[in-house]
Amino acid sequence: MTFKELYLSGQVPFEEIDRYISRWNRSDDERTLAKYLGLNADEEDVWIDDSDEALKEMLDARERVAGTPVTLGKTDIIVNKNGFGALPIQRISFDDAKVLLRKAYDAGVRFFDTARFYTDSEEKIGYALSDVREHIYIATKTAATTAEGFWKDLETSLHNLKTDYVDIYQFHNPAVCPKPGDGSGLYEAMLEAKEQGKIRFIGITNHRMSIAEEAIESGLYDTLQFPFNYLSTEREIALAKACAEHEMGFIAMKALSGGLITNSAAAYAFEAQYENVLPIWGVQREKELDEFISYIDNPPTMTDEIRALIENDRKELAGDFCRGCGYCMPVSYTHLRAHETK
């Protein structure tokens, strides 16, 4: 972890910066040293042009991170390794969803992932968390295939979430990797939305290796969201490493492989091996949330026992099989449209 991650999570005092600097073997390169410390551009300028004290004051103005911190690539979004996956809250009432979302927030969860496709999930997040909007990060998605559809989805999402901006706006499992000049107008719409301040960062989600790899190599995206768990293939695991090399945030969906993985501690321990990976856990019941909340202060680590369990599960379950994501199912937009007209 970087000095900044450790400091914001309360694991080291500010004075520890001197030890980090002393380990640096390229003392003539302050900009690269600042990157090594985990500083963003503004913090880098303050530190280089002013003083350690000015940097400390700047960092102290940020909210502390509960638990193990992870930085999403170049976004400077730093949260703990417990993202809230809001797909399952479609299945519960608004008031039950509010109980879950507020409990997660009160425990230190700060990253919430949803989608326009998830019927009323966005509305429930807006209902439960609009009063703490400035203290959380919201990622949502559009499955639009045209620029017109993109803008309709974005405006609907902003309305439902009760916000005027989204932290990460993601293309939702597109059949091709959107790029400038591809004729769809989608990536251009992303850039315009960012220019207007309606989104902060551009992301993409997918289930196809080829598109995920293309998105990483393109350099066009701030984050990639992809299925990632201890049943993943070596090629899939390599995506997380490639994102780290390209300074791209990696958001791990299906961390429990659609319910095939039943030991959440083992699932967390696997994800924790990758410092750049932010797992999002799909939560529908309070007891499920309690389990993941407990990992904020007591994160499971890889042990011989967990390693043996993972190895056994990989022998039994790994391969080409249904991970329960539902993406191949026929889609009815009746329910979605009903919520859009509320």
Per-segment meaning from a language model:
Residues 12, 20-59:
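Amphipathic alpha-helical packing elements
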Residues 65-136:
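N-terminal binding-site loop/beta-alpha segment at the start of enzyme catalytic domains
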Residues 66, 174-333:
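Beta/alpha (TIM)-barrel catalytic core signal, keyed to glycine-rich beta->alpha loops juxtaposed to Asp/Glu
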Residues 83, 113, 167-170, 203, ...:
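Conserved beta-strand positions in the central sheet of alpha/beta enzyme cores
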Residues 93-103, 148-160, 207-214, 264-267:
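Short, acidic/polar
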Residues 126-133, 158-163, 216, 241:
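Acidic (Asp/Glu)-rich catalytic clusters
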Residues 161-177:
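Active-site groove signature of glycoside hydrolases
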Residues 334-341:
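Conserved small/polar residues in nucleotide/adenosyl-binding loops
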